[in-house]
Regions:
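GHKL (Bergerat-fold) ATPase N-terminal catalytic module, capturing the glycine-rich phosphate-binding loop
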Residues: 1-209
Length: 209
C-alpha cells in the first residue's frame, strides 16, 4: 500500500519557513532551553581572526537538563514530537532539575529546526545527569539536495566518556557524516543498481565538503 514519503529538503523548508530572522531563531532555541529548565541562556559570535578562528563561529548554550542518547533518537531528531501538543504537565523532580514546573514556550516539535538558520555545519553537545556526553554533527545544507529522502540522510551521534575521548569521537562522527555523499547500491526492478544522489548536485556538495 502506498505511503507518504518526505524529501529531505522538507525539513529545511519547514525550519526556515518558521523563522523570519536571526533573532527569532535564537529566541526559539532559547525557548526550548527554558522549557528544559535552563536559566543561563547565552549566545556568542566570534568573527574570523579572533583567537586564530578561521571562520565565523556561533555558540548557543544553556544550563538546561540536557539530553541522553535515547532523548536525541526518540525526540530531537523526530519531527513533531507531541509532548507540548498534548499539554503534558511536568512534575517537580529530577527531570525539572527540582524547579517548579514551567509553562512551555517553544514551538510544538519544530522549534529545534531553528538551529538550521544559524549556519552550517553544526556540532551539538548535550549531557543529561548520570549520562555520558552526547555529540552530534550535521550540515544542514545537506537537506537542500532535492534527490534525498529523509531516510537517506545520516546524522552521526557519539557518546563521549572523557575529555581524551572527545577528539577521537569528534573525528569519527565527521567521517561518518561523509557517508551521506557516497554512492549506494539499491535493488530496482529486481536488479542491483548504483545510486548517486549527488551526481546532479556537485556544486552543493563542494560547498559542504
Amino acid at each position: 500500500m502506498p505511503q507518504f514519503r518526505a524529501k529531505a529538503r522538507a525539513v529545511d523548508l519547514l525550519g526556515k519557513g518558521q523563522i523570519s530572522d536571526l533573532p527569532t531563531a535564537i529566541s526559539e532555541l532559547w525557548k526550548n532551553g527554558y522549557d528544559a529548565y535552563g536559566d543561563a541562556l547565552e549566545a556568542y559570535i566570534y568573527l574570523s581572526g579572533y583567537e586564530n578562528i578561521k571562520k565565523p563561529l556561533f555558540i548557543l548554550q544553556d544550563d538546561a537538563k540536557g539530553m541522553s542518547r535515547k532523548d536525541i533518537l526518540e525526540k530531537w531528531i523526530v519531527l513533531g514530537t507531541d509532548s507540548k501538543t498534548r499539554n503534558e504537565i511536568d512534575i517537580k523532580g529530577e527531570d525539572t532539575l527540582w524547579k517548579e514546573p514551567r509553562i512551555k514556550m517553544g514551538e510544538k516539535g519544530i522549534g529545534r529546526l531553528s538551529v538550521a538558520y544559524l549556519g552550517s555545519p553544526m556540532l551539538m553537545l548535550t549531557k543529561k545527569k548520570n549520562e555520558p556526553l552526547q555529540i552530534l554533527y550535521f550540515d544542514w545544507r545537506t537537506l537542500e539536495n532535492y534527490n534525498l529522502f529523509l531516510e537517506d540522510v545520516n546524522i552521526p551521534i557519539a557518546s563521549v566518556i572523557s575529555s581524551e575521548d572527545f577528539k577521537d569521537k569528534f573525528k569519527k562522527i565527521r567521517i561518518d557524516f561523509l557517508d551521506n555523499f557516497n554512492s549506494r547500491k539499491e535493488i530496482v526492478d529486481g536488479k542491483e543498481v548504483i545510486i548517486d544522489f549527488w551526481q546532479e548536485q556537485f556544486l552543493l556538495k563542494d560547498t559542504i565538503i
